[in-house]
Amino acid sequence: MAAGQPRPPPPPSSVRTERVLRAACAAMAAAGALLLGFSAETKTVIFVQKKAVPKDVQALWVLIVAAAAAAAYHAAQLARCLCMDRLAGGGGGCRRLRRAVACATFLLDKGCAYMVLATTVAALQACFVGLLGVEALQWSKLCNIYTRFCEQAAAGMVCSLVAAAGMAVLSAFSARDLFRRRRPCSPCVQVQQV
């Protein structure tokens, strides 16, 4: 900055909160994807080596992809927030463009939150079979054999659930921003009754 130019005012607390929440959501979703993606354990059972990997449970694989996509989306949105504030200087700009960006952000935030929550719940449901077994189908409890894999998968799913909760809060921030930018209604014309 030049010596004579005033500093731009700091962003409002809601903008700072949104930035922190976006960074936290990106970090938690990335942590969940990494924990699940790198979880693997090999055990030898009766002279046969068997490796447990996330691809064995398709719901885990889908969760890894969804969490990684959500982390990338929130990192990109965080970069957009920082760039838009720097370029616009906190105000001005095209109102129509800002409304369109707010609408797209709202829809994408909602979709991202739903996607991560749905895939996490599906992975939890699939993993409960491995945790508890199904006696009617004679499926044994796999977490007794692959304990480290199950613990790492559980930690990844907890990270994904926390990220999904944060994304739900972020979609509320997006909704507030969208409706704050909407066009005001034209003044109501009062009709006089005769």
From Swiss-Prot:
Tell me the compartments it is located in.
Cell membrane
Task: Give the transmembrane ranges.
Answer: 28-48, 59-79, 114-134, 153-173
Give residue ranges on the Cytoplasmic side: 1-27, 80-113, 174-194
Task: Tell me how this protein sits in the membrane.
Answer: Multi-pass membrane protein
What is one cellular component GO term in this UniProt entry?
Answer: plasma membrane
> Could you tell me which residue ranges are on the Extracellular side of the membrane?
49-58, 135-152
S-S bonds = none
Which keywords has UniProt assigned to this entry? Cell membrane, Membrane, Transmembrane, Transmembrane helix
Per the record, the major location class is membrane
- Family, per the entry? Belongs to the Casparian strip membrane proteins (CASP) family.
Q: How does it assemble?
A: Homodimer and heterodimers.
Q: Which PANTHER family match?
A: CASP-LIKE PROTEIN 2C1-RELATED, CASP-LIKE PROTEIN 4A4
What is the name of this protein? CASP-like protein 2C2
Q: Which organism is it from?
A: Sorghum bicolor
